[in-house]
Amino acid sequence: MKTKLRSVTQNLNLDHLNKEEHIMKSITKKLLAGLLGTAMTLSLAACGGGSTNAGTSSAAAASTAAADTGKTYKVGIVQYVSHASLDQISDNIKSELDAKGKELGVTFDYEPYFQNGEGDATVINQIASELVADNVDIIVPIATPAAVVMQTATEDNKIPVVFSAVSDPVSAKLVKSMDAPGGNITGTSDALDTAAIFKLMTTAAPDCKYVGLLYDQGQDSSTQAIADAKAYLDKAGIKYIEKTGATTDEINLAAQSLIAEKVDAIFTPTDNTVMTAELSIYESLAKAGIPHYCGADSFALNGAFCSYGVDYANLGKMTADMVVDVLVNGKDPATTPVQTFDNGIATVNTETCKTLGMDLNKIKDEFAPLCTQVVETTTAESFEE
């Protein structure tokens, strides 16, 4: 099956990343960036433009956007790993930067500085060093692990950071508070309304008595959501069991263990490790009659029964808008509040719903009072552009 083949490929990418290939790609990018930079310098010299760095973009805060017409800003985008949610975010960051660039008469040059760490901490640290050496004007890390590395890498050079899809920026020690980050960093958060997901779960199955919590203990994005889930289930008198994993293989084993436990349902927050593995576990869960409730619409796209959470397309656009505010409009990240989203949209996978033996129309009617909208999807590898 197409989706199964892809999940195996993802697993190989995550667990056996060829670092030499990454280095060669990095060298190629640097050579291309150098050639493009030389050409751009010659071109802009004639019209008085040029590329900025973190210092000059801060110095330009007092200038109007019109005065910056013709400038080129180097934007480093660091995607933590490849999966539908983060792919959608990066795609929308790029498209919004392109649109804003045309609108403002400036260029946001991200292509030579976009890199994907594929979930490998060593590679992500290497990417951080490369972006600092490239003297980019801003770094945009996507997901908590990437944001933590980029924050550390920019502490001394003061390159501003605008993160995307960080579930709990305060607990991750990226910001002092959501309203006043306090450092040279701000961004967008995909903080999860855990209680809302469990309301959907218990509405669809009022007799739900045993819930599996499936996540990666090493993912900061899961920490608070799992704590909230336990508190909710304890208060509701619902028994739960935790199963964790740090790789696709381990998540597969954890899912099989939950099937053997005969849980009534499974909950996963906005966990990147489980998201990467979803295509390889959704069929076995559905065939076992276990609905999987998750914290991002990409889970439902990849086969989970239901998700409730952030619209990642809008989150990507908002992240790009914040990048523009910092670079062009001179906003200080330290005083720019972290943006959060709560669109109240539940996404139901109609194919999985059928496999589970659930009545889609009944589910939609039951979910309607609890959501602003109920969206239908079918299993696919990625969102259509």
What are these regions (language model features)?
Residues 112-176, 271-286, 290-295:
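Beta-alpha junction/loop-to-helix N-cap segments that form part of ligand/metal-binding clefts
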Residues 68-69, 168-210, 310-331:
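Hydrophobic alpha-helical segments within soluble ligand-binding/sensing domains
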Residues 42-46:
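C-terminal motif of bacterial Sec signal peptides marking the signal peptidase cleavage site
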Residues 101-124, 184-185, 232-248:
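Short beta-strand elements in bilobed, periplasmic/extracellular small-molecule ligand-binding domains
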Residues 48-51:
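Bacterial signal peptide processing site
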Residues 75, 93, 186-236, 332, ...:
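An alpha-beta-alpha
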Residues 19, 325-385:
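Hinge/cleft segment of the Venus flytrap/periplasmic-binding protein
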